[in-house]
Amino acid sequence: MRHVLPYIYNKVGHAVDCNRDKMFRKLFLVSLFAFVALAPAFAQKKEISQAKSAIKAGKAVEAEASMRKLLADSAHRQNEKIWLVLFDAVKKQYEDVNEKMYLKQSTDTAKLFDAAYRMFGVLEALDSVDAMPDKDGRIKLKYRRKHADYLDAYRKNLYTGGSYFLNKQDYPRAFKLFAAYIDCASQPLFESQQYASRDKRLPSAAFYALYS
């Protein structure tokens, strides 16, 4: 009996050690899978934070490039925060050029109109994300009215920019801005503005777009 008991204890101890090893392996694998799954989210959050800091530091161009790089991955395109930071980056570029023009400092006027064009593109894209139904099939628009009212004040820059590039004989850019001006009339984002019935410049914008 004295010889049997140590044998039993050894067997039990070995079984406990095996179970403990299996448990640790499972925990390790679970932790590893969790890390792999969450790593992209942490990296994305870090890039967004860095882009915000870049905008404040006067590096809006770099911030825009960073956010567009994120959006190149379709997995990120439903992240509203990326679109909002991207818009802030483009808006800051517009404001910087506009301020220089106001102060009569040397600047590239074309950059103002190009930034205005990109502002519309960003918020129109965000609107399509905003309009997606939730898991219950409901659509809750958080940004549409606010962004439509905001961009309405800048829309004239698309028309003015089209005319500017037309006079410069830069026809591709002229067409791009006139087309964006016209397209607002059919964008769900601007439904409340009723451009199709209220905007008397639409026919001339269409004419200049064809001319471009």
Q: Where on the chain are the PLM-derived regions?
A:
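Post-signal peptide N-terminal segment of secreted/secretory-pathway proteins
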Residues: 56-173
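Targeting/processing segments of secretory and organellar proteins
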Residues: 3-6, 12-15
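Sec/Tat signal peptide C-region and signal peptidase I cleavage site
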Residues: 38-43
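Leu/Val/Ala/Ile-rich N-terminal alpha-helices, chiefly Sec-type signal peptides and the beginnings
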Residues: 47-50, 54-56
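Sec-dependent N-terminal signal peptides
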Residues: 26-36
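Positively charged n-region of N-terminal signal peptides that target proteins for export
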Residues: 2-4, 20-27
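Alpha-solenoid helical-repeat scaffolds
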Residues: 152-212
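Residue-level detector of intrinsically disordered/flexible regions characterized by low predicted structural confidence
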Residues: 10-13, 21, 28, 47
